[in-house]
């Protein structure tokens, strides 16, 4: 009887730890798949015009229905700031890119399972806070104060893989479709120039 009681107490103590690890991994994996801020100096990322700096300011807020739920959502307010190398060193109006992403874990975490699969879908807004014409008089795109705004969806999956050769290291593979519906656009010229469908793939490795 005493032996059975000890075994029962051990099981009772282990179950909350396993549940806690499951919850922690869910939150950790979801946030690892979310937006990350950065600051770059001089050139920025993907910009042709000289910059002093570019900064992406972002934070992620995880929402879950209950602690042991396999479904959750992340709200991400995001802004991008740029200071140009011009007279008076102006800081341009920020780009606003808030989004909400919904996640669903297809299989519960298990210590012996190396792969965990998630589905996700996002609703994203992107605008630059300007009110000028989209095109210049010569027909080129107005990158100075041209009004830019778009809304779109992202749908895809990401897969986590625990790397056995490196402790506490996880590999993420993500693939998703970005779709810009015409009825959600303020300007059809954006779709004519850039299209409304894109396919993204990326691989990340995190050490927690």
Question: Residue ranges of each PLM-predicted region?
Answer:
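Short glycine/proline- and aromatic-enriched beta-strand/turn motifs that initiate or cap beta-hairpins
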Residues: 19-65, 100
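Sec-dependent N-terminal signal peptides
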Residues: 4-18
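Outer-membrane pore/translocation modules
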Residues: 21-35, 73-207
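Generic structural signal for short, flexible, solvent-exposed coil/loop and linker residues
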Residues: 6-7, 48, 64, 110-112
């Amino acid at each position: 009887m005493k032996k059975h009681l000890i075994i029962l107490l051990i099981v009772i103590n282990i179950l909350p730890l396993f549940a806690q690890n499951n919850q922690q991994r869910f939150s950790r994996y979801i946030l690892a798949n979310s937006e990350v801020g950065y600051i770059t100096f001089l050139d920025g990322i993907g910009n042709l015009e000289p910059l002093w700096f570019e900064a992406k300011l972002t934070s992620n807020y995880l929402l879950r229905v209950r602690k042991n739920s396999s479904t959750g959502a992340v709200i991400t307010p995001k802004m991008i700031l740029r200071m140009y190398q011009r007279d008076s060193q102006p800081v341009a109006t920020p780009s606003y890119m808030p989004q909400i992403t919904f996640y669903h874990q297809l299989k519960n975490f298990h210590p012996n399972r190396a792969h965990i699969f998630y589905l996700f879908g996002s609703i994203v807004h992107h605008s630059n806070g300007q009110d000028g014409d989209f095109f210049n008089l010569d027909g080129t795109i107005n990158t100075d104060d041209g009004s830019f705004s778009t809304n779109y969806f992202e749908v895809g999956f990401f897969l986590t893989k625990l790397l056995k050769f490196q402790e506490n290291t996880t590999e993420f593979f993500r693939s998703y479709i970005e779709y810009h519906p015409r009825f959600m656009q303020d300007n059809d010229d954006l779709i004519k120039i850039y299209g409304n469908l894109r396919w993204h793939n990326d691989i990340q490795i995190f050490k927690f």
